[in-house]
């Protein structure tokens, strides 16, 4: 296990941060792809339609071509959707990390190992929190695939929690996709509670891709720890 340390983002990290974020998002495409294939209405199209083609026309070739094109188009849809989301992020908050986070009462941290950035996480204040709450939102958690299993993701989340405590926040909140199984397991294992879920569009509802909302409530300075 290679040693690592966590520090605040510096401008020289920018290219590596973008690459790490992009690769991390692309890793979710296969999970979403296989998830959709298991849905009941997907089974009508694959393998339902190929079987029907064989029964009606007797053509295995036509059924094979349909199956290939169906899988190719489905994979392409998810890939393009992912790339569009990444491009949107790269043109938004990740275009100028210092301005988006460090100069906006938040922060952006990187985990460094062997002189390379291998993990990232960010945090920003929630603009309109519930009445009586002061909330910090966790963003952009990602760890290089070659450096997972070393506790880096957990350490990055702890950095955000400590930052929130130091700044007097009452909660740390975050959103994540329901296909991000490892992230969900990490958050729940660290004490985050699922407080809601929603669909960003009708299309996402139809294919069962939802967004989970998690909250970690921080004890007040006067509240005794159990």
From Swiss-Prot:
One of its GO terms (biological process) is gastrulation. The keyword Transmembrane applies. It is an enzyme of class 2 (transferase). InterPro entries: Acyl_CoA_acyltransferase, GNAT_dom, NAT_camello-type. The keyword Transmembrane applies. It comes from the Eukaryota. GO terms for cellular component: membrane. Keywords: Acetylation, Acyltransferase, Developmental protein, Gastrulation, Membrane, Transferase, Transmembrane, Transmembrane helix. The chain crosses the membrane at residues 33-55, 60-82. Residues 69-221 form the N-acetyltransferase domain. Its EC number is 2.3.1.-. PROSITE patterns: GNAT (PS51186). CDD domains: NAT_SF (cd04301). GO terms for molecular function: N-acetyltransferase activity. It is a multi-pass membrane protein. It is found in: Membrane. The modification N6-acetyllysine is found at residue 204. Belongs to the camello family. Probable acetyltransferase. Has no detectable histone acetyltransferase activity towards histone H3 or H4. This is N-acetyltransferase family 8 member 2. It comes from Rattus norvegicus (Rat). The gene is Nat8f2.
């Amino acid at each position: 296990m290679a040693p690592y340390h966590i520090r605040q983002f510096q401008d020289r990290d920018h290219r590596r941060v973008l690459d790490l974020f992009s690769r991390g998002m692309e890793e979710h495409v296969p999970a979403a792809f296989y998830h959709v294939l298991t849905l009941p209405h997907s089974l009508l199209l694959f393998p339902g339609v190929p079987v029907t083609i064989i029964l009606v026309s007797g053509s295995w070739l036509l059924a094979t071509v349909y199956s290939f094109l169906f899988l190719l188009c489905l994979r392409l849809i998810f890939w393009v959707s992912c790339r569009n989301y990444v491009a949107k992020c790269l043109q938004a908050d990740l275009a100028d990390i210092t301005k988006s986070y460090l100069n906006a009462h938040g922060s952006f941290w990187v985990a460094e190992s062997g002189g390379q950035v291998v993990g990232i996480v960010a945090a920003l204040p929630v603009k309109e929190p519930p009445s009586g709450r002061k909330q910090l939102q966790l963003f952009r958690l990602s760890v290089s695939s070659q450096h997972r299993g070393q506790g880096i993701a957990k350490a990055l989340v702890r950095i955000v929690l400590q930052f929130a405590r130091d700044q007097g926040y009452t909660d740390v909140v975050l959103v994540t996709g329901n296909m991000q199984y490892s992230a969900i397991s990490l958050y729940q294992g660290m004490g985050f509670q699922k407080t809601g879920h929603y669909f960003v569009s009708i299309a996402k509802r139809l294919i069962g891709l939802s967004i989970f909302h998690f909250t970690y409530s921080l004890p007040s300075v006067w509240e005794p720890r159990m």
